[in-house]
Amino acid sequence: ILATAIWVRDHNPDRFVALVTKDINLRMKSKAVGMVAQDYLTDRVEEVKVETSQKEVHFIDNAPAEVLQELAYSQNNAVDWRAVCHDRPYPNQLFKFKVQNEDTLCARYDADIDKILLVRKREACGIKPRNDEQKFAIDACLNKKIKLVSLTGGAGTGKTLLALASALEQERDYDQIILSRPTVILGNQDIGFLPGDQKNKMSPFLQPLMDNLNVIKAQYRPSSKEYQRLEALVKDEKLLITPLAYIRGRSLGNAYFIIDEAQNLTPHEIKTIITRAGE
């Protein structure tokens, strides 16, 4: 391949010739012999610089005492953003206000009312947040005005658990809760075909999702109504745990859709998932 690319370049001196490959080793060899090589960019997410205020929590440590008082104790727990910001915040932008004793007040900008609202500590299906970041996550997942929530964080930070607990907390408002993840093996190493039907084949991939469901169920006694309700959701397929491989062609209306391990998806797969959403 490399020799062919060099031949084409040498026989077309008036044209720009580059070797396009996703093989990084081949690109290194091309560079060593002076051949221009590029990565295949079509199936790759463009790295666009995101403004800091769009992706991080805005920390304010010098807010006036009267603003903190109004945010924490007023009837609507809301303050005018002009009291703490020079520029209008982005919709659903998150804030942390430093108060005494190293505590913080968590807040979120609501574009509908043009005010900054207090984010209270809420629990979802018995799961309580352990830090401010989890508090923000539950608040976003329980907010029906926010149609798309993206949770990022390290391993074991509770992303899937919080999303699933929030969905189960609102299960009466949706026709179906769909929990899915791509069938990607660690290290992308193929282990061959698995025996059994579709359910048996997908079981190893979907086990992490079942583990999160079992964490929620473990809070209740098997004889309790809550435990029986969760069991019924799975049995009646109102809570459906499924691989992403079978989502093409479906229309998901009035559904709470959770995608786990989304970083393993290609841009084409992300587009396919988004176009499945109904009203």
Segments and roles (model prediction):
Residues 1-18, 22-144:
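Feature 3881 marks metal-assisted phosphotransfer/nuclease machinery
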Residues 4-11, 32-36, 40-43, 144, ...:
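Conserved, well-folded catalytic cores of nucleic-acid-processing
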Residues 161-229:
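Conserved P-loop
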Residues 235-271:
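Conserved RecA-like ASCE ATPase "motif II neighborhood" in helicase/translocase motors
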Residues 151-153, 163:
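Hydrophobic anchor at the beta1->P-loop junction of P-loop NTPases
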Residues 156-158:
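Conserved glycine(s) of the Walker
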Residues 10-12, 143, 170-172, 248-251, ...:
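Conserved catalytic network of the ASCE P-loop NTPase/AAA+ motor domain
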Residues 144-150, 254:
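Pre-Walker A (Motif I) flank of P-loop NTPase domains
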